């Protein structure tokens, strides 16, 4: 109950008189067993949980006996993970929000016309953060400096702002921070993204996580998405590594799948070739487990510290 998630999904289940199935630890075999035993229909978990289920032993052969809807958020699940979950019989619903917005501000509602798309394209659309949630009055992407609304063209990147009855009034005993977050009458999320023509917002990065290399802005999420498509990659996080010439360059921390031939650093960099611009490709890759908070979020501030100390190339760590 210490997390904003506890204000939403937990009470919704109680209100309709449904049954809670509580898992004390993320053990894929136990989760699958409980889904079957209790006839679970809904599951809520961070992308970390989806990763563990999608890449657990035998998951590629597993098929659920009944459909299970999953609400996930906190980070963008990769299209690779979404495809793996869908193949098992899960329906992935991606949401986006903050504690300051009392949980979800957007939901990626599935559109019927997506069913005709090939699976990679469908998963890509499902990985977006989605359309304005019913409790949110307004949701826009604006120029961070001027507050001007940017066009909904899927390419104009700005800060995601929102307002509505479920947005907080302010930070306790911190009027300065409150004024800063509500500049222009909107709540400033600090997240950078684009608005698509269909009204769906897509998160590109936290403002502090944007990598500026040679004057070019690089979205760490874009690099992560492409690396996550590699068949040996279980999960990945990309941060900026200081560089004396370029200012910053992308540094990727990669956790590998078990039972799959491990790629080399050069092999992963070559994987990126042709899928992204040259300046966006990671120049440093570290193989390791990713540090996380108690709620499963990747601690990028720790990775940024690790990146400063990482050598030019690192075949394996940890």
Where are these predicted regions, by residue range?
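Conserved AMP-binding/adenylation subdomain of ANL enzymes
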Residues: 2-41, 56
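Adenylate-forming
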Residues: 2, 29, 33-37, 47-69, ...
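Structural motif
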Residues: 24, 38, 57, 137, ...
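AMP-binding/adenylate-forming catalytic core of the ANL superfamily
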Residues: 43, 164, 169-170, 180, ...
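Acidic/polar alpha-helix N-cap and adjacent early helical turns
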Residues: 307-318
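Conserved AMP-binding/adenylate-forming
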Residues: 18, 36, 68-70, 77-95, ...
């Amino acid at each position: 109950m210490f997390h904003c998630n506890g204000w939403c999904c937990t009470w919704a289940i109680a209100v309709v008189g449904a049954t809670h199935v509580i898992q004390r630890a993320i053990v894929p075999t136990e989760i699958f067993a409980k889904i079957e035993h209790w006839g679970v229909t809904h599951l809520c978990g961070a992308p970390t949980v989806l990763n563990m289920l999608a890449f657990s032993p035998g998951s590629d052969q597993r098929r659920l006996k009944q459909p299970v809807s999953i609400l996930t958020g906190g980070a963008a699940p990769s299209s690779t993970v979404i495809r793996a979950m869908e193949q098992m019989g899960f329906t992935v619903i991606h949401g986006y929000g903050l504690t300051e917005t009392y949980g979800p501000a957007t939901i990626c509602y599935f559109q019927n016309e997506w069913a005709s798309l090939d699976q990679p394209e469908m998963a890509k659309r499902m990985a977006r953060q989605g359309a304005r949630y019913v409790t949110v009055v307004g949701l826009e992407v604006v120029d961070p400096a001027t507050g001007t609304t940017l066009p909904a063209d899927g390419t104009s990147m700005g800060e995601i702002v929102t307002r509505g009855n479920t947005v907080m009034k302010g930070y306790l005993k911190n009027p300065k921070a409150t004024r800063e977050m509500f500049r222009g009458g909107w709540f400033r999320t600090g997240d950078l993204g684009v608005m698509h023509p269909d009204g769906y917002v897509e998160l590109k990065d936290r403002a502090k996580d944007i990598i500026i290399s040679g004057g070019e802005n690089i979205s760490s999420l874009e690099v992560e998405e492409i690396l996550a498509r590699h068949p040996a990659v279980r999960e990945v996080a990309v941060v900026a590594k200081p560089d004396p010439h370029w200012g910053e360059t992308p540094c990727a921390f990669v956790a590998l799948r078990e039972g799959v031939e491990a790629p080399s650093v050069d092999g992963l960099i070559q994987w990126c070739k042709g899928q992204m611009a040259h300046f966006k490709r990671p120049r440093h890759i570290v193989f390791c487990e990713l540090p996380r908070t108690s709620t499963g979020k990747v601690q990028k501030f720790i990775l940024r510290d690790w990146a400063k100390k990482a050598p030019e190339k690192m075949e394996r760590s940890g």
